Amino acid sequence: MASSTMALSSPSLAGKAVKLGPTASEIIGEGRITMRKTAGKPKTVQSSSPWYGPDRVKYLGPFSGESPSYLTGEFPGDYGWDTAGLSADPETFAKNRELEVIHCRWAMLGALGCVFPELLARNGVKFGEAVWFKAGSQIFSEGGLDYLGNPSLVHAQSILAIWACQVILMGAVEGYRIAGGPLGEVVDPLYPGGSFDPLGLADDPEAFAELKVKEIKNGRLAMFSMFGFFVQAIVTGKGPLENLADHLADPVNNNAWNFATNFVPGK
């Protein structure tokens, strides 16, 4: 509508502006409010899903007993188990839930980063140092650190410069995840979507709900894996794939029990 008001020629209305409809700014403003309300609504999950609701899968199956009243099966990864009562307070639960999901994502990336370079090195790809906990120390060597073993890719010689780059890049991503940015508005900081979901995996509510469960399950396994990688590095001084190869070659002598008993006093 080119104009929302007009002056009528009738004597009784002469010189008076009569409003025929809402202005463009009002239309746009209302549209924005409606869009935000729609985007902010949680996507519902059908009650037939085995991962949500009161009849969801529990941590001990049919022997799980009664779940705490505050664990209703609303969120992914809720198996009705909270012996320490960490989820009893809603605010604490919301904070811990966000921390868990973020740590899950970092652990999945970290586990892949620990295994993949060593896997490539064992298959003929040349790295300066493929073992994850030894690679970073190469920056203190005389020649510095070459990313992926390629001096023409990224040649790092300053740990402070690496730290600054990490803070800037990770801070920018986290800031956008929480507060939004020029690429779009973020409605849910935990599942921002938009530019963080270029493949549109979250478009279907049912598929998205199942992907949330898969993410939290794989993330919890990844956190345990990272803990195991740290312990292996301290005890054996080897990477995860080398430890796996040693175990498969001699499972009787190369296992967690034998390594643990080496620390028994008097042995």
From Swiss-Prot:
Annotated residues for binding of chlorophyll b 2: R105, V154, L183
N2-acetylarginine carried by residues: R36
Single GO term (MF): metal ion binding
Keywords per UniProt: Acetylation, Chlorophyll, Chloroplast, Chromophore, Magnesium, Membrane, Metal-binding, Phosphoprotein, Photosynthesis, Photosystem I, Photosystem II, Plastid, Thylakoid, Transit peptide, Transmembrane, Transmembrane helix
Transmembrane segments: 101-121, 153-173, 221-241
Cofactor binding remark: Binds at least 14 chlorophylls (8 Chl-a and 6 Chl-b) and carotenoids such as lutein and neoxanthin.
Residue numbers binding chlorophyll b 4: Q166, R177
Residues at which chlorophyll a 2 binds: H103
InterPro entries: Chloro_AB-bd_pln (IPR001344), Chloroa_b-bind (IPR022796)
Record-listed Phosphothreonine modification sites: T38
Binding residue positions for chlorophyll a 4: N218
Record has NAD as a keyword: no
Membrane topology: Multi-pass membrane protein
Residue numbers binding chlorophyll b 1: Y59
Binding, chlorophyll b 5: Q166, F263
Post-translational modification: Photoregulated by reversible phosphorylation of its threonine residues.
Annotated compartments: Plastid, Chloroplast thylakoid membrane
Ligand binding (chlorophyll a 3): Q138, L148, E215
GO BP annotation list: photosynthesis, light harvesting in photosystem I; response to light stimulus
Sites where the protein binds chlorophyll a 6: H247, A256
Entry binding sites for chlorophyll a 5: K214, Q232
Any one GO CC term of the record: photosystem II
Domain notes: The N-terminus of the protein extends into the stroma where it is involved with adhesion of granal membranes and post-translational modifications; both are believed to mediate the distribution of excitation energy between photosystems I and II.
Quaternary structure, from the entry: The LHC complex consists of chlorophyll a-b binding proteins.
Family: Belongs to the light-harvesting chlorophyll a/b-binding (LHC) protein family.
The protein's name: Chlorophyll a-b binding protein, chloroplastic
Species annotation: Spinacia oleracea (Spinach)
